[in-house]
A protein has these predicted regions:
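Glycine-rich phosphate-binding loops of nucleotide-dependent enzymes
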Residues: 1-319
Length: 319
């Protein structure tokens, strides 16, 4: 709201403002005129008053999206992951306990600094645990570091894709296979043909838009970079997939494809834990939502029956 007030103040002073965003609600709220681009090309320029959100989406994607979220048809099974009294040594994470089931998409909501990201990083062994217990399929796992966590069946798609997700100087094949190189070892050598074949399979199955697998990942769009990172983790065959802001900075068409990938993983019996700042996204994709506040778990709600107001109230509980 403060940003919007500043933008409106600058506009009233005669400043011209170019505002770039994937969030259509913001665009329609503050813009006088909207320009839509797709694949580096100009598509349309119209007065904001003449546009609806659905019309913007259609122009952005090049086709009509009847639903913003895929229909949930995943089957939820028994408890797979049990987290008890988890606290961080150097983070604000404080006595967090929850359960996640096979085939479940578990959302994590909260304000910035609430402990959402810290929770995923703690489970994955990036940060030091002060106390608590993590049990996977009835067996305690220590997850003292990412290497150990990967061996135990965990994968983490990080919040800052460009800083901690991709290897920008490497190509798509190298980014896809880098966490699973042992699969391609033949003595001291790597089986390049097998690596190429695997990468081609994922490019096709995840519909990665790229000239070829030799393309540097840094030249891809955000959505396609995210698909490559997902392919990397799928190669490790994780049981629990931790996703931190998986659709941040991604256009609405690519978002739908990411949502479908998440749902497909849940349908295969994987447990998906997903942090998002977009409450509509959590409500549309997840089965259940944990709400973090001040490093503590302030509530757990059913995505079918809750609403944004209830989530925001819980998010402010320990602020």
């Amino acid at each position: 709201e403060h940003l919007f007030r500043i933008i409106n103040m600058l506009r009233d002073r005669g400043c011209g403002i170019i505002y770039i965003s994937h969030k259509m609600e913001e665009i329609l709220r503050i813009s006088d005129e909207v320009t839509i681009m797709r694949d580096g090309k100009w598509i349309a320029t119209k007065a904001a008053s003449e546009l609806t959100m659905d019309e913007i989406i259609k122009l952005m994607v090049g086709r009509e999206l009847t639903n913003r979220y895929p229909e949930k048809d995943n089957k939820i099974g028994d408890v797979l992951l049990n987290v008890e009294n988890l606290s961080g040594e150097y983070t604000n994470l404080n006595n967090v306990s929850f359960q996640a089931r096979r085939g479940e998409i578990l959302g994590v909501a909260g304000l910035d600094g609430s402990g959402r990201t810290e929770l995923l990083e703690q489970i994955f062994g990036i940060t030091t645990k002060k106390s608590g217990k993590i049990t996977l399929d009835g067996k305690e796992v220590k997850n003292r570091n990412p290497h150990e966590s990967i061996k135990n069946g965990f994968a983490l798609l990080t919040e800052e894709r460009r800083a901690t997700g991709i290897f920008g100087i490497l190509n798509i094949r190298e980014n896809t296979t880098i966490s699973s190189l042992k699969k391609y070892q033949t003595g001291p050598f790597l089986n390049k043909k097998k690596m190429k074949d695997t990468t081609d399979e994922y490019i096709k199955s995840l519909r990665v838009k790229t000239p070829n697998q030799e393309t540097k990942i840094s030249s891809l769009s955000g959505g396609n970079q995210q698909k490559v990172i997902l392919a990397r983790w799928l190669l490790t065959d994780p049981t629990v997939l931790l996703l931190d802001e998986p659709t941040r900075g991604i256009d609405v068409g690519a978002k739908y494809e990411i949502y479908q990938l998440i749902l497909d993983l849940a349908k295969k019996g994987k447990t998906v834990i997903m942090v998002s700042s977009e409450m509509a996204e959590l409500l549309g994709v997840c089965d259940k939502i944990l709400v973090m506040s001040g490093g503590r778990l302030s509530g757990e709600v059913d995505a079918k029956t809750t609403n944004q107001e209830e989530i925001m109230t819980l998010a402010a509980k320990y602020v």
